[in-house]
Regions:
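Binding-site signature for planar aromatic cofactors or substrates
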Residues: 1-208
Length: 208
């Protein structure tokens, strides 16, 4: 096995029944080693007809209830989630030669949670949430710049920019979490946790 992956998944299979503990361990290591955006993940969604789409978003929180990101609710992903709450996340940390895939169901976070995170953002980011009609077509770039200036004039007090109703967070409650380690000669290691109907986690090693 690659030296960077000294924590073998076979040992995790024997010792760890909680996938969140393993996620936390890997995520903390990624924050120390990944050069750019260790919280970046590929988010896969689909329409109610099953047409898929994927994009990069940033993880902004997690606990045993799920994994949280924020977005414009009227964006393409927002509209797809409203139609079909089933989604998947994939973290890939090249510096560690590790990957985590998460499958689950999305639900909107509470308003108070969204408000608290929104208020922690930089002023320009909060203004951007008002100005950008995410995923809609622009006549030109100037249209967006004018919208930014409009909302800067409207909300000149940087400490008093309310959260737009069209902007909030989504929480992915996982039903499966798979951990992947790079191995020599493509003999990778895979460990998958699945949530049972009794709300308990089972685990199994998978062939690469």
């Amino acid at each position: 096995m690659n030296e960077k992956n000294s924590l073998g998944l076979n040992k995790c299979f024997l010792d760890l029944d909680d996938p969140f503990k393993l996620f936390e361990s890997w995520y903390e290591e990624a924050k120390k080693n990944e050069i750019n955006d260790p919280n970046a993940l590929a988010l896969g969604t689909a329409t109610k007809q099953g047409v898929p789409s994927v994009r990069m978003v940033l993880l902004k929180g997690y606990d045993k209830n799920g994994f949280v990101f924020y977005t414009n609710l009227n964006s393409q992903k927002g509209n797809e989630i409203k139609e079909n709450p089933n989604a998947t996340m994939c973290f890939h940390w090249k510096s560690l030669l590790r990957q985590i895939r998460i499958v689950g169901t999305l639900s909107q976070v509470e308003d108070e949670v969204a408000d608290n995170y929104f208020n922690s953002r930089a002023y320009e980011s909060r203004i951007g949430a008002w100005a950008s009609k995410q995923s809609s077509e622009l006549v030109n770039r100037e249209e967006l710049i004018k919208s930014l200036e409009k909302f800067k004039n409207k909300y000149q007090d940087q400490n008093n920019v309310p959260r737009p109703n069209h902007w909030s967070g989504w929480n992915l409650k996982p039903t499966s979490i798979e951990f992947w380690l790079d191995g020599d000669n493509r003999i990778h290691e895979r460990l998958k946790y699945k949530l049972t109907a009794n709300n308990e986690w089972t685990k199994s090693l998978l062939s690469p």
